[in-house]
Amino acid sequence: MANSRRTAAIIVAGGRGLRAGGGGPKQYRTLAGQPVIYRSMQPFCTHPDVFAVQPVTSPDDIALFEQAVAGLTHRPPANGGATRQQSVYSGLEALAKDAPDIVLIHDAARAFVDAALISRAIVAAQRTGAAVPTIPVTDTIKQVNGTNDVEATPDRATLRIAQTPQAFRYDVILEAHRRAAREGRDDFTDDAAIAEWAGLTVATFEGDAANMKLTTPEDFVREESRLAALLGDIRTGTGYDVHAFGDGDHVWLCGLKVPHNRGFLAHSDGDVGLHALVDAILGALADGDIGSHFPPTDPQWKGAASDKFLKYAIDRVHARGGRIANLEVTMICERPKIGPLREAMRERIAEITGLPVSRIAVKATTSERLGFTGREEGIAATACATIRLPWGPNGLSG
């Protein structure tokens, strides 16, 4: 991919978007808890080949903008104009002091752009100098007259739906905008149209059907439903386990053999951390508890390693088409000290479950010398598991 200093992005967010309803500019409304403009800017701000993101906003919306995109790295917003064309021109001029080679121009109302589409845009602009993402027209199109009578049926094989980000050599599109401003042309609805008017050949590259523009209240309702379906049925389960100390020189905790002056009194290896996690996962599935799946009266589990139990619980999630979102376990004991072992425990649980370490938390506390853990008679553990299951045909997960 090209050097990251070569490409900048303009995010056009100066419009009012009143057709979308909601009582304010649509780019500051939320979808699944995130502002639309955050969703549309974030992929550019984190793309390795985009060195600068130049937002364009209404001066009246600065406070809304700063709140909506908190945490993203971007240039100070340029002031938007009365039309989209004027807003883009403002963004182009704002980049002039540190001019990029390639500029991507993206509508803030397109909240589903992704890194792959951005990469395709950069490559297309490098290859052609002016390019627009498109998707095929699948409906039959009718051309009508002033009284809405059909005049023609264009061949849809020659038609495409244009999207953003549209990609250009910066110097070429800047000059096209400057010329349009000099000649009083402010009626272009996208930047590809300005490039065409200026005599440039505009290529196309593969767009993305999901990269739709949010325009009407119905668009927001539909996309909220779609995003909710993608999240699936989110469930949480909790678990608790305790084992008393007995004779021995080690204990098993979160999959690790930990030297200690006592051992556990247990049917299996007594790993309270993993047992609590197993119960939490089974609870999220509404699938009984560890004792119902691995009865302590069954001799086959005598001395069994608890990683088998955890793998079994994970397999139960996968068998229902689900996945683990997060696992958390809290160890409650005076000794052994958990702090020095915390990262090794996280890594061991990650190894057993196949999850990234970033989705596993291991915490520790004491009971302030109260109760059986305070008297060092044993160890307790609590756990929490968050899982996602797919929705079934009746709107419920299986």
From Swiss-Prot:
GO terms for biological process: isopentenyl diphosphate biosynthetic process, methylerythritol 4-phosphate pathway; terpenoid biosynthetic process. Signal peptide: none annotated. The record marks 156, 213 as: Positions MEP for the nucleophilic attack. GO terms for molecular function: 2-C-methyl-D-erythritol 2,4-cyclodiphosphate synthase activity; 2-C-methyl-D-erythritol 4-phosphate cytidylyltransferase activity; metal ion binding. Its EC number is 2.7.7.60, 4.6.1.12. The record marks 19, 26, 267, 366 as: Transition state stabilizer. Pathway: Isoprenoid biosynthesis; isopentenyl diphosphate biosynthesis via DXP pathway; isopentenyl diphosphate from 1-deoxy-D-xylulose 5-phosphate: step 2/6; Isoprenoid biosynthesis; isopentenyl diphosphate biosynthesis via DXP pathway; isopentenyl diphosphate from 1-deoxy-D-xylulose 5-phosphate: step 4/6. Its cofactor is a divalent metal cation. It catalyses: 2-C-methyl-D-erythritol 4-phosphate + CTP + H(+) = 4-CDP-2-C-methyl-D-erythritol + diphosphate; 4-CDP-2-C-methyl-D-erythritol 2-phosphate = 2-C-methyl-D-erythritol 2,4-cyclic diphosphate + CMP. A divalent metal cation binds at residues 241, 243, 275. CDD domains: CDP-ME_synthetase, MECDP_synthase. Residues 235-398 are annotated as: 2-C-methyl-D-erythritol 2,4-cyclodiphosphate synthase. Coiled coil: none annotated. Keywords: Isoprene biosynthesis, Lyase, Metal-binding, Multifunctional enzyme, Nucleotidyltransferase, Transferase. The keyword Lyase applies. Residues 1-234 are annotated as: 2-C-methyl-D-erythritol 4-phosphate cytidylyltransferase. Bifunctional enzyme that catalyzes the formation of 4-diphosphocytidyl-2-C-methyl-D-erythritol from CTP and 2-C-methyl-D-erythritol 4-phosphate (MEP) (IspD), and catalyzes the conversion of 4-diphosphocytidyl-2-C-methyl-D-erythritol 2-phosphate (CDP-ME2P) to 2-C-methyl-D-erythritol 2,4-cyclodiphosphate (ME-CPP) with a corresponding release of cytidine 5-monophosphate (CMP) (IspF). In the N-terminal section; belongs to the IspD/TarI cytidylyltransferase family. IspD subfamily. This is Bifunctional enzyme IspD/IspF.
